[in-house]
Amino acid sequence: VYKRQFLDSLLERASKEPKTIVLPEGEDERILQAAHAVAARKAAKLIILGNPEEIKAYFAQNNWDMEDIELIQPETSEKLESYANLLYELRKAKGMTPNDARKLALNYNYFGTLMIKSGDADGMVSGANHSTADTVRPALQIIKSAHKERSVSSALILVANDKPYIFSDCAIIINPSEQELADMALASSETALKFGIEPKVAMLSYSTRGSGSGGMVDKVRNATKLAQEMLQSEEYKNLPIMIDGEMQADAALDSVVARKKAPDSQVAGQANVLIFP
């Protein structure tokens, strides 16, 4: 029940200021079903990339209308050349040729990302049929990071036991440094706030408050200090973010364990943002 309520609340918020979102995986029925659900709630204006005739046939087969949905086939798009030229200008210093740029612009993830860069869309949802690398690479090359001085990481939202949790980083950085872990903690906190979640961040480890030792423990402990220092900056000091660590997963999530292992922690036992080392 909570999962449905959580999704409904997100759709309701989105419908108040609908954005234009590109869906580059129009060949996947799950994407088309999701597009119908979002469009029916008027939560976004959607652009689906794929074969228009096949997509129209699928919608007709299900008796769905296509209001607020635009279909584009990159191979025949009138914008293809301008997008290819844009990509060439952005990447020529890296050795990209005009021919390389045109080939890449035909890749649906690149095409969708170039739409955003050109101002023809606000965002893109991808990854159902593409690897993380193939999904993220165009964004890193074309859009780039919002914070140039910080590392790029990923976060996922999981709803369990009527509560939302955010996990980071489960897809991009394999062995994060202390600074990268601190960056993850702050970036995930920002994500939580955007979803209406007041972040209580646990920096996970196999140790809780010095119960274990080793290089990994030191890394997480130092990352926690870095993140807490970053919280004092002008950007974050007035935001309701709490970060604590190092702590084991049971201490982060279980209130009984938390009272034994970290009784003075404001995060232990009630963490909703988990940073994996």
Residue ranges of model-derived segments:
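Anion-binding alpha/beta catalytic cores of soluble intermediary-metabolism enzymes, centered on
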Residues: K3-A268, N272-P277
